[in-house]
Protein backbone atom coordinates (compact mmCIF):
# COMPACT_ATOMS: atom_id res chain seq x y z
CA UNK A 1 0.00 0.00 0.00
CA UNK A 2 1.26 3.47 -0.85
CA UNK A 3 1.75 6.07 1.87
CA UNK A 4 3.10 9.59 2.07
CA UNK A 5 5.58 11.26 4.37
CA UNK A 6 4.87 14.98 4.66
CA UNK A 7 7.56 17.17 6.27
CA UNK A 8 6.99 20.63 7.72
CA UNK A 9 9.19 22.29 5.09
CA UNK A 10 6.44 21.54 2.58
CA UNK A 11 7.85 18.53 0.75
CA UNK A 12 6.26 15.09 0.43
CA UNK A 13 8.01 11.74 -0.02
CA UNK A 14 6.12 8.64 -1.10
CA UNK A 15 6.81 5.00 -0.30
CA UNK A 16 5.32 1.57 0.32
CA UNK A 17 4.03 0.37 3.67
CA UNK A 18 5.70 -2.80 4.93
CA UNK A 19 4.11 -2.53 8.38
CA UNK A 20 0.59 -1.20 8.96
CA UNK A 21 -0.61 2.38 9.21
CA UNK A 22 -4.20 2.71 10.40
CA UNK A 23 -4.58 6.41 9.69
CA UNK A 24 -1.64 8.70 10.31
CA UNK A 25 1.20 9.28 12.75
CA UNK A 26 3.25 12.38 13.42
CA UNK A 27 6.51 13.15 15.16
CA UNK A 28 9.82 14.94 14.92
CA UNK A 29 11.71 13.51 11.96
CA UNK A 30 15.39 12.64 12.48
CA UNK A 31 17.96 10.45 10.76
CA UNK A 32 20.45 7.84 11.96
CA UNK A 33 23.70 7.35 10.03
CA UNK A 34 24.88 3.96 11.32
CA UNK A 35 25.10 0.92 9.06
CA UNK A 36 23.96 -1.38 11.88
CA UNK A 37 22.35 -1.04 15.29
CA UNK A 38 18.77 -0.53 14.20
CA UNK A 39 17.41 -2.79 16.97
CA UNK A 40 19.09 -0.71 19.67
CA UNK A 41 17.87 2.49 18.02
CA UNK A 42 14.26 1.34 17.85
CA UNK A 43 14.22 0.44 21.55
CA UNK A 44 16.16 3.47 22.80
CA UNK A 45 13.68 5.57 24.85
CA UNK A 46 15.42 8.73 23.63
CA UNK A 47 13.63 8.28 20.30
CA UNK A 48 10.19 8.64 21.88
CA UNK A 49 7.84 10.72 19.66
CA UNK A 50 10.25 10.68 16.71
CA UNK A 51 10.07 9.33 13.17
CA UNK A 52 13.43 7.73 12.42
CA UNK A 53 15.01 7.66 8.95
CA UNK A 54 17.85 5.17 8.43
CA UNK A 55 20.38 6.47 5.91
CA UNK A 56 21.93 3.08 5.12
CA UNK A 57 20.08 1.68 2.07
CA UNK A 58 19.34 -1.81 3.47
CA UNK A 59 18.00 -2.23 7.00
CA UNK A 60 16.97 -5.43 8.76
CA UNK A 61 19.32 -7.93 7.13
CA UNK A 62 20.24 -9.57 10.46
CA UNK A 63 16.72 -9.44 11.88
CA UNK A 64 15.64 -8.83 15.46
CA UNK A 65 17.05 -10.97 18.29
CA UNK A 66 16.23 -11.33 21.98
CA UNK A 67 19.48 -9.89 23.35
CA UNK A 68 20.00 -6.43 21.87
CA UNK A 69 16.96 -4.57 23.15
CA UNK A 70 17.67 -1.34 25.04
CA UNK A 71 14.22 -1.40 26.64
CA UNK A 72 11.14 -3.60 26.66
CA UNK A 73 9.55 -2.11 23.54
CA UNK A 74 10.24 0.19 20.58
CA UNK A 75 9.60 3.90 21.17
CA UNK A 76 9.74 5.42 17.67
CA UNK A 77 6.57 6.70 16.02
CA UNK A 78 7.49 5.32 12.58
CA UNK A 79 10.44 3.95 10.62
CA UNK A 80 11.52 5.10 7.15
CA UNK A 81 14.01 3.16 5.01
CA UNK A 82 14.97 2.69 1.40
CA UNK A 83 14.78 -1.10 1.60
CA UNK A 84 13.83 -3.45 4.44
CA UNK A 85 15.15 -7.00 4.36
CA UNK A 86 12.30 -9.51 4.31
CA UNK A 87 14.31 -11.96 6.43
CA UNK A 88 16.81 -11.80 9.24
CA UNK A 89 19.92 -13.63 8.08
CA UNK A 90 21.39 -14.36 11.50
CA UNK A 91 21.20 -17.48 13.62
CA UNK A 92 19.83 -15.49 16.56
CA UNK A 93 17.09 -13.68 14.66
CA UNK A 94 13.57 -14.27 15.99
CA UNK A 95 11.71 -11.78 13.80
CA UNK A 96 12.18 -9.77 10.65
CA UNK A 97 12.18 -5.99 10.99
CA UNK A 98 8.66 -5.76 9.54
CA UNK A 99 7.33 -8.52 11.80
CA UNK A 100 8.70 -6.81 14.89
CA UNK A 101 7.23 -3.43 13.99
CA UNK A 102 3.89 -5.00 13.04
CA UNK A 103 3.71 -6.59 16.49
CA UNK A 104 3.91 -3.13 18.04
CA UNK A 105 1.72 -1.42 15.40
CA UNK A 106 4.55 0.85 14.30
CA UNK A 107 4.44 1.77 10.59
CA UNK A 108 7.39 0.94 8.35
CA UNK A 109 7.67 2.98 5.14
CA UNK A 110 9.99 1.51 2.48
CA UNK A 111 11.19 2.44 -1.01
CA UNK A 112 11.61 6.06 0.04
CA UNK A 113 14.29 8.24 -1.53
CA UNK A 114 16.07 8.49 1.81
CA UNK A 115 19.03 10.33 0.30
CA UNK A 116 16.77 13.18 -0.84
CA UNK A 117 14.87 13.08 2.45
CA UNK A 118 18.02 13.36 4.56
CA UNK A 119 19.28 16.22 2.40
CA UNK A 120 15.99 18.01 3.06
CA UNK A 121 16.37 17.50 6.82
CA UNK A 122 19.96 18.74 6.71
CA UNK A 123 18.86 21.84 4.79
CA UNK A 124 15.63 22.70 6.60
CA UNK A 125 16.63 21.27 9.98
CA UNK A 126 14.91 18.81 12.26
CA UNK A 127 11.17 19.37 11.96
CA UNK A 128 7.77 17.81 12.44
CA UNK A 129 6.53 15.26 9.92
CA UNK A 130 3.41 13.23 9.29
CA UNK A 131 3.07 9.77 7.77
CA UNK A 132 -0.32 9.43 6.13
CA UNK A 133 -2.31 7.48 3.57
CA UNK A 134 -3.35 10.80 2.06
CA UNK A 135 -1.18 12.68 -0.45
CA UNK A 136 -2.44 15.93 1.09
CA UNK A 137 -0.25 17.35 3.83
CA UNK A 138 -1.57 18.43 7.21
CA UNK A 139 1.66 18.75 9.19
CA UNK A 140 1.27 20.81 12.34
CA UNK A 141 3.81 22.51 14.55
CA UNK A 142 5.86 20.97 17.32
CA UNK A 143 3.53 19.30 19.79
CA UNK A 144 3.63 20.22 23.47
CA UNK A 145 4.51 16.79 24.78
CA UNK A 146 6.44 15.53 27.79
CA UNK A 147 8.00 12.26 26.64
CA UNK A 148 10.12 11.63 29.74
CA UNK A 149 7.06 10.81 31.82
CA UNK A 150 6.06 8.14 29.29
CA UNK A 151 9.40 6.30 29.37
CA UNK A 152 10.61 6.73 32.96
CA UNK A 153 10.09 3.94 35.48
CA UNK A 154 7.31 4.42 38.02
CA UNK A 155 8.85 2.25 40.71
CA UNK A 156 12.18 2.01 42.49
CA UNK A 157 14.16 -1.11 41.58
CA UNK A 158 17.60 -2.32 42.66
CA UNK A 159 19.97 -4.45 40.61
CA UNK A 160 23.21 -6.17 41.59
CA UNK A 161 24.83 -6.76 44.95
CA UNK A 162 27.73 -5.31 46.89
CA UNK A 163 30.12 -2.79 45.37
CA UNK A 164 29.44 0.93 45.39
CA UNK A 165 25.76 1.79 45.52
CA UNK A 166 24.67 4.10 42.69
CA UNK A 167 21.33 5.76 42.08
CA UNK A 168 20.40 5.92 38.40
CA UNK A 169 17.80 8.64 37.79
CA UNK A 170 15.71 7.35 34.91
CA UNK A 171 14.82 9.95 32.30
CA UNK A 172 14.58 7.11 29.76
CA UNK A 173 17.72 5.09 30.39
CA UNK A 174 19.17 2.51 28.02
CA UNK A 175 19.68 -1.00 29.35
CA UNK A 176 23.34 -0.81 28.34
CA UNK A 177 24.02 1.95 30.87
CA UNK A 178 22.76 -0.29 33.65
CA UNK A 179 24.74 -3.24 32.27
CA UNK A 180 27.93 -1.16 32.09
CA UNK A 181 27.61 -0.32 35.78
CA UNK A 182 26.69 -3.86 36.86
CA UNK A 183 29.64 -5.26 34.90
CA UNK A 184 31.89 -3.09 37.06
CA UNK A 185 30.53 -4.57 40.28
CA UNK A 186 28.09 -1.82 41.20
CA UNK A 187 24.76 -2.10 42.95
CA UNK A 188 22.36 0.15 41.08
CA UNK A 189 19.01 1.52 42.23
CA UNK A 190 16.90 2.90 39.39
CA UNK A 191 14.48 5.65 40.45
CA UNK A 192 11.77 7.64 38.62
CA UNK A 193 12.83 10.89 37.00
CA UNK A 194 10.94 13.02 39.53
CA UNK A 195 12.22 11.34 42.70
CA UNK A 196 12.78 13.96 45.41
CA UNK A 197 16.33 14.57 46.70
CA UNK A 198 15.23 13.49 50.18
CA UNK A 199 14.07 10.12 48.85
CA UNK A 200 17.40 9.64 47.09
CA UNK A 201 19.26 10.61 50.27
CA UNK A 202 17.32 7.90 52.09
CA UNK A 203 18.77 5.31 49.71
CA UNK A 204 22.28 6.31 50.90
CA UNK A 205 23.98 6.18 47.49
CA UNK A 206 27.71 6.51 46.93
CA UNK A 207 27.18 8.19 43.57
CA UNK A 208 24.59 9.49 41.14
CA UNK A 209 23.96 8.77 37.45
CA UNK A 210 21.65 11.00 35.41
CA UNK A 211 20.51 9.06 32.37
CA UNK A 212 19.73 9.82 28.77
CA UNK A 213 16.16 10.44 27.68
CA UNK A 214 13.88 12.05 25.07
CA UNK A 215 12.72 15.58 24.42
CA UNK A 216 13.78 19.14 25.14
CA UNK A 217 15.67 19.45 28.45
CA UNK A 218 13.76 22.66 29.20
CA UNK A 219 10.64 20.56 29.66
CA UNK A 220 12.31 19.40 32.88
CA UNK A 221 13.15 22.86 34.19
CA UNK A 222 10.92 22.28 37.22
CA UNK A 223 13.41 19.60 38.30
CA UNK A 224 16.52 21.78 38.02
CA UNK A 225 16.58 22.83 41.70
CA UNK A 226 16.49 19.16 42.74
CA UNK A 227 19.26 18.28 40.29
CA UNK A 228 21.33 21.17 41.60
CA UNK A 229 21.02 19.82 45.14
CA UNK A 230 21.90 16.27 44.14
CA UNK A 231 25.03 17.05 42.11
CA UNK A 232 26.30 19.13 45.04
CA UNK A 233 26.01 16.09 47.33
CA UNK A 234 27.18 13.13 45.26
CA UNK A 235 29.81 12.21 42.68
CA UNK A 236 27.86 12.50 39.44
CA UNK A 237 27.99 11.01 35.98
CA UNK A 238 25.53 12.59 33.53
CA UNK A 239 24.83 11.19 30.07
CA UNK A 240 23.07 12.85 27.11
CA UNK A 241 19.84 14.41 28.47
CA UNK A 242 21.32 14.13 31.95
CA UNK A 243 24.31 16.15 30.70
CA UNK A 244 22.04 18.91 29.43
CA UNK A 245 20.17 18.98 32.73
CA UNK A 246 23.43 19.41 34.66
CA UNK A 247 24.29 22.32 32.37
CA UNK A 248 20.89 23.98 32.81
CA UNK A 249 20.91 23.38 36.57
CA UNK A 250 24.23 25.20 36.88
CA UNK A 251 23.24 28.17 34.74
CA UNK A 252 24.50 27.07 31.36
CA UNK A 253 22.54 27.59 28.13
CA UNK A 254 21.48 24.88 25.69
CA UNK A 255 20.93 25.32 21.97
CA UNK A 256 19.35 23.11 19.32
CA UNK A 257 21.44 21.80 16.45
CA UNK A 258 20.07 22.09 12.93
CA UNK A 259 19.78 18.33 12.48
CA UNK A 260 21.43 16.79 15.52
CA UNK A 261 23.95 13.99 15.94
CA UNK A 262 22.56 10.49 15.53
CA UNK A 263 24.93 7.71 14.63
CA UNK A 264 27.57 5.31 15.85
CA UNK A 265 30.57 7.02 14.27
CA UNK A 266 30.84 10.52 15.76
CA UNK A 267 34.48 11.55 16.41
CA UNK A 268 35.10 13.35 19.70
CA UNK A 269 38.32 14.96 20.94
CA UNK A 270 39.25 14.19 24.56
CA UNK A 271 41.34 17.13 25.78
CA UNK A 272 42.69 15.13 28.74
CA UNK A 273 43.81 12.06 26.82
CA UNK A 274 44.76 14.16 23.79
CA UNK A 275 43.12 11.67 21.48
CA UNK A 276 40.10 11.28 19.20
CA UNK A 277 37.49 8.75 20.27
CA UNK A 278 34.67 7.38 18.14
CA UNK A 279 31.35 7.68 19.92
CA UNK A 280 27.70 6.74 19.68
CA UNK A 281 25.38 9.75 19.80
CA UNK A 282 21.71 10.63 19.74
CA UNK A 283 20.85 14.24 20.54
CA UNK A 284 19.41 17.43 19.12
CA UNK A 285 20.62 19.79 21.85
CA UNK A 286 24.08 20.82 23.02
CA UNK A 287 25.50 23.10 25.69
CA UNK A 288 26.29 26.52 24.28
CA UNK A 289 30.05 26.99 24.52
CA UNK A 290 29.91 30.69 25.40
CA UNK A 291 27.75 29.99 28.45
CA UNK A 292 30.71 28.20 30.08
CA UNK A 293 32.92 31.31 30.14
CA UNK A 294 33.74 32.34 33.70
CA UNK A 295 32.10 29.24 35.15
CA UNK A 296 33.73 26.41 37.15
CA UNK A 297 33.42 23.94 34.27
CA UNK A 298 36.03 22.97 31.71
CA UNK A 299 35.22 21.65 28.26
CA UNK A 300 36.85 18.24 28.01
CA UNK A 301 35.16 16.73 24.96
CA UNK A 302 34.60 18.44 21.59
CA UNK A 303 32.88 17.10 18.48
CA UNK A 304 35.48 16.96 15.71
CA UNK A 305 32.90 17.45 12.95
CA UNK A 306 31.27 20.68 14.10
CA UNK A 307 33.17 21.82 17.21
CA UNK A 308 30.17 21.49 19.54
CA UNK A 309 30.56 20.70 23.24
CA UNK A 310 30.43 16.95 23.94
CA UNK A 311 31.38 16.89 27.59
CA UNK A 312 32.32 19.04 30.58
CA UNK A 313 33.95 18.51 33.96
CA UNK A 314 33.67 20.55 37.15
CA UNK A 315 36.97 21.96 38.37
CA UNK A 316 36.29 21.42 42.07
CA UNK A 317 33.51 18.84 42.35
CA UNK A 318 33.32 15.24 41.09
CA UNK A 319 30.92 15.98 38.23
CA UNK A 320 31.56 14.42 34.82
CA UNK A 321 28.97 15.19 32.18
CA UNK A 322 29.02 13.83 28.61
CA UNK A 323 26.74 14.42 25.65
CA UNK A 324 27.55 11.14 23.90
CA UNK A 325 26.84 7.55 24.99
CA UNK A 326 29.88 5.90 26.63
CA UNK A 327 27.94 2.63 26.91
CA UNK A 328 27.62 2.57 23.08
CA UNK A 329 25.07 0.00 21.84
CA UNK A 330 25.12 0.58 19.01
CA UNK A 331 28.62 1.80 18.33
CA UNK A 332 32.25 1.57 19.43
CA UNK A 333 33.34 1.22 23.04
CA UNK A 334 36.16 3.77 22.80
CA UNK A 335 34.84 5.81 25.73
CA UNK A 336 33.90 3.03 28.13
CA UNK A 337 36.66 4.39 30.38
CA UNK A 338 34.22 7.15 31.40
CA UNK A 339 32.49 4.68 33.72
CA UNK A 340 35.86 3.72 35.23
CA UNK A 341 36.81 7.36 35.84
CA UNK A 342 33.45 7.99 37.47
CA UNK A 343 33.86 5.00 39.78
CA UNK A 344 37.32 6.23 40.79
CA UNK A 345 35.69 9.35 42.22
CA UNK A 346 33.09 7.23 43.96
CA UNK A 347 35.77 5.03 45.57
CA UNK A 348 38.29 7.77 46.37
CA UNK A 349 36.03 10.73 46.95
CA UNK A 350 38.20 12.99 44.83
CA UNK A 351 38.11 14.60 41.40
CA UNK A 352 40.24 12.74 38.85
CA UNK A 353 38.62 14.06 35.67
CA UNK A 354 40.90 16.99 34.93
Curated annotation (Swiss-Prot):
Thermal dependence of function as given in the entry: Thermostable up to 63 degrees Celsius.
Protein purpose: Small subunit of the glutamine-dependent carbamoyl phosphate synthetase (CPSase). CPSase catalyzes the formation of carbamoyl phosphate from the ammonia moiety of glutamine, carbonate, and phosphate donated by ATP, constituting the first step of the biosynthetic pathway leading to arginine and/or urea. The small subunit (glutamine amidotransferase) binds and cleaves glutamine to supply the large subunit with the substrate ammonia.
Record: residues binding L-glutamine: 46, 213, 215, 241, 244, 282, 285
Single annotated GO MF: glutaminase activity
Oligomeric form and interacting partners: Composed of two chains; the small (or glutamine) chain promotes the hydrolysis of glutamine to ammonia, which is used by the large (or ammonia) chain to synthesize carbamoyl phosphate. Tetramer of heterodimers (alpha,beta)4.
Family the UniProt entry places it in: Belongs to the CarA family.
InterPro entries in alphabetical order: Anth_synth/Amidotransfase (IPR050472), CarbamoylP_synth_ssu (IPR006274), CarbamoylP_synth_ssu_N (IPR002474), CarbP_synth_ssu_N_sf (IPR036480), Class_I_gatase-like (IPR029062), CPSase_GATase1 (IPR035686), GATASE (IPR017926)
Database matches in NCBIfam families: CPSaseIIsmall (TIGR01368), PRK12838.1 (NF009475)
Record keywords, A-Z: Amino-acid biosynthesis, Arginine biosynthesis, ATP-binding, Glutamine amidotransferase, Ligase, Nucleotide-binding
Region: CPSase, residue numbers: 1-163
Reactions catalysed: hydrogencarbonate + L-glutamine + 2 ATP + H2O = carbamoyl phosphate + L-glutamate + 2 ADP + phosphate + 2 H(+)
Pathway membership, UniProt: Amino-acid biosynthesis; L-arginine biosynthesis; carbamoyl phosphate from bicarbonate: step 1/1
EC numbers, comma separated: 6.3.5.5
Principal EC category: ligase
Protein name: Carbamoyl phosphate synthase arginine-specific small chain
Encoding gene (name): carA
Listed SMART domains: CPSase_sm_chain (SM01097)
GO annotation terms (biological process): 'de novo' pyrimidine nucleobase biosynthetic process; 'de novo' UMP biosynthetic process; glutamine metabolic process; L-arginine biosynthetic process
Keyword ATP-binding carried by entry: yes
Annotated active site: 240 (nucleophile), 325, 327
Protein species of origin: Geobacillus stearothermophilus (Bacillus stearothermophilus)
Gene3D superfamilies: 3.40.50.880, Carbamoyl-phosphate synthase small subunit, N-terminal domain
Glutamine amidotransferase type-1 domain mapped to chain residues: 165-352
Amino acid sequence: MKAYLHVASGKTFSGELAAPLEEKVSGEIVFFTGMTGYQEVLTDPSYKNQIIVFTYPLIGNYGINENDFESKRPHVEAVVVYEASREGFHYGAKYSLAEYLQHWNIPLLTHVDTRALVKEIRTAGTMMAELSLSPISAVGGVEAVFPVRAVSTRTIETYGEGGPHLVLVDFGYKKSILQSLLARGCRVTVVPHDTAPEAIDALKPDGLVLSNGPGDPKQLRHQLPAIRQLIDRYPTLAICLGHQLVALATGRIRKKLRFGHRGANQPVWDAVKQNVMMTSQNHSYVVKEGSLVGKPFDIRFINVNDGSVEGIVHRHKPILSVQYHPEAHPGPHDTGYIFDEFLQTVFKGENVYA
